[in-house]
Amino acid sequence: MGSTCVRIAIDAMGGDHAPNEIVAGAVRASEELGVKVLLVGDPQQIASALPPKTNLERVEIVPAEEAIAMDEEPLNAVRRKRKASINVAMDLVKREQADAIFSAGHSGAAMASALLRLGRLPGVDRPAIGTVFPTIKAGKPVLILDVGANVDCRPKFLEQFAVIGSIYSQYVLGTGEPKVGLLNIGEEDTKGNELALRTHQLLKDNSNINFIGNAEGRDVLSGEFDVIVCDGFVGNILLKFAEAIGGVILQILREELPQGLHGQIGTAILKPNLKRIKQRMDHAEHGGALLLGVSGVCLIGHGSSQAPSVFNAIRMAKEAVDNQVMQQLQSQYEILHSTSD
């Protein structure tokens, strides 16, 4: 992108803490990352949430008449509410008035809106939601996909996830030759259900990816894999479990530290370490999950996202734009077309 200012469309009305936390994180990103944020939603509510002395050269309010609630059926709501904030924000990307979009609202609505407005990349049957997990090797995250977009998958879909994930890992996460694994119940080629067995063979035969075999649950955070593929049903359970790990570990540590003066001294000594542990394991540090396979950079945030998560999601979106991830994915469409039925 060079020196061009990256423009991020923000669904300001999406999420449990919208618009205040969404706006706060977006404004911080405009100040610290040098991006321009387009806040889409109710102008009055957004204006009220803006911090004093906001630099309006990098913050723009884009009116939207409606919002999609978490309990609405996503496809029907997206089609019915054409002026909903997620649709207006997605249209900004479609018209190339924004380079990327972030929403912490209804993830199903975000996916439906992206498919209807942006469309799929050539050769992609099903987009996948990919999220970055920390591993025991500092600075070496693993990309997991799908974590919720497709609860039922065919082997061909998982093969495409592996190709898309490899491209993203290489060009955005900076992995030299991404090691791809298939989430399974054993490392042997003969383990797993029919989906796993058929997918394993497809991945093994695909010369466009560096498939190193099955990944068991214990391998997910080992740092041995750069990309792990699974269906969205299993992936979403894995995501929610992983999000809880950091809080559980910190809570156990707090309970096990001795009480009294010795405990206070120990806590003071360990405080910097505990903070670093929290940062490495906190999903807010990554901010959002990417909807990979649509014709645009789309970040989906947790419904409970607060300002730090929003900031980090926008950072991820900027990195994806700066690293030209869409151009890289589009240039690989022949590889995607070559995937087997």
From Swiss-Prot:
Stored InterPro entries: FA_synthesis, Phospholipid_synth_PlsX-like
Main localization of the protein described in the UniProt heading: cytoplasm
GO annotation, cellular component aspect: cytoplasm
Biological processes, Gene Ontology terms: fatty acid biosynthetic process; phospholipid biosynthetic process
Keyword terms: Cytoplasm, Lipid biosynthesis, Lipid metabolism, Phospholipid biosynthesis, Phospholipid metabolism, Transferase
Pathway: Lipid metabolism; phospholipid metabolism
Record's keyword annotation contains Lipid metabolism: yes
Location of this chain's protein in the cell: Cytoplasm
Top-level taxon: Bacteria
Molecular function GO labels: phosphate:acyl-[acyl carrier protein] acyltransferase activity
Record EC number: 2.3.1.274
Reaction(s) catalysed (UniProt annotation): a fatty acyl-[ACP] + phosphate = an acyl phosphate + holo-[ACP]
Transmembrane domains' residue ranges: none
Pfam families: FA_synthesis
Enzyme class: transferase
UniProt-listed Gene3D superfamilies: Isopropylmalate Dehydrogenase (3.40.718.10)
Self-association and partners: Homodimer. Probably interacts with PlsY.
Role, per record: Catalyzes the reversible formation of acyl-phosphate (acyl-PO(4)) from acyl-[acyl-carrier-protein] (acyl-ACP). This enzyme utilizes acyl-ACP as fatty acyl donor, but not acyl-CoA.
Family to which the UniProt record says this protein belongs: Belongs to the PlsX family.
NCBIfam families: plsX
Protein name as annotated: Phosphate acyltransferase
